[in-house]
A protein has these predicted regions:
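Conserved mixed alpha/beta catalytic, RNA-binding, or beta-rich assembly cores of soluble enzyme
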Residues: 1-282
Length: 282
């Protein structure tokens, strides 16, 4: 059997390995409570068994990490990274998303429903291997590396630029990659929007770099991101899992999504009530 292995981080940065459509390893949960999974799955205290059931549900429900992967979906949350991207694609504020999909790696997406399907229900993707059926589903010409399913947002940005896209959103996990993306030279008529997800366990020394370079950052269960936000006071939406709009462009993208769903614009109400957030912040 060909190598088929996908590593994701879910439910508070718990690392999970899936091989040939089956869970082969679940590490210990890093947090006790996630507001999103509390709301949607009634999980008050995260255990390894809860994680197993949730990941098995995703595999069965939409074929996560398998050839049966459903790629187009409706909104999962009212406001998350995928939902923000979906609305702004529909409105023409962005024309391409450099994203990541299991079985595919880095991929260019221009279909709002596919942006939601690819990113809306899959947690942080650490590594993956090619799955032909998923690659065919997103279109092999949109895949950075169909042979290895490589994850490289910077090379994805270069690919988007080579296609002539002008308003490019890039989703990325906390890493030095964020700075490389921001510093990559582009023409004056090109805008690059950087959206950072899965920030739980971000190191204190890395947080300033995130805020200096990103347009939107999700709080997740990150103690350091949330504490830093209290000092620099960016606009945000949400009390339990805030989404911070770091730049003016980030605020425009966030507020565009909020307007689409009839919500008031982002606010700067500080200090935030940490008691409504994940337990514990790490």
């Amino acid at each position: 059997m060909t190598n088929d292995e996908h590593v994701i981080e879910a439910l508070g940065k718990t690392r999970i390995t899936i091989k040939n459509g089956k869970i082969t390893d679940i590490q210990e949960p890093s947090i006790d409570y996630c507001p999103i999974f509390g709301k949607y799955h009634n999980i008050e205290h995260i255990t390894k068994e809860d994680i197993r059931k949730n990941i098995e549900y995703r595999i069965d429900d939409f074929g996560m990490c398998t050839k049966n992967r459903v790629l187009k979906m409706d909104d999962m949350l009212s406001v998350g990274i995928s939902e923000i991207l979906r609305s702004n694609l529909e409105q023409g504020n962005i024309d391409c998303v450099v994203g990541a999909c299991e079985g595919v790696g880095t991929v260019l997406l221009t279909d709002p429903d596919m942006v939601q399907g690819v990113g809306g229900r899959v947690s942080g993707l650490v590594s993956t291997t090619p799955i032909k059926e998923i690659i065919d589903g997103v279109g092999i010409d949109n895949v950075l590396d169909s042979k290895k399913a490589t994850l490289n947002p910077l090379e994805g940005l270069k690919m988007a630029l080579s296609r002539g896209f002008k308003n490019i959103a890039v989703t990325v996990l906390p890493s030095e990659m964020i700075k490389l993306l921001r510093e990559y030279p582009v023409d004056d008529d090109v805008n690059v929007f950087i959206l950072v997800a899965h920030t739980t366990k971000t190191k204190k020394e890395d947080v300033k770099m995130l805020f200096d370079n990103a347009d939107i950052i999700t709080a997740c269960a990150s103690k350091n991101v949330i504490e830093y936000a209290q000092s620099v006071k960016p606009y945000y939406y949400g009390n339990s899992v805030p989404i911070y709009a770091i730049s003016e462009e980030g605020k425009r993208l966030l507020d565009s999504r909020l307007e689409c769903i009839g919500k008031p614009p982002s606010v700067r109400d500080y200090p935030q009530d940490l008691s409504k957030m994940a337990r514990k912040l790490i």
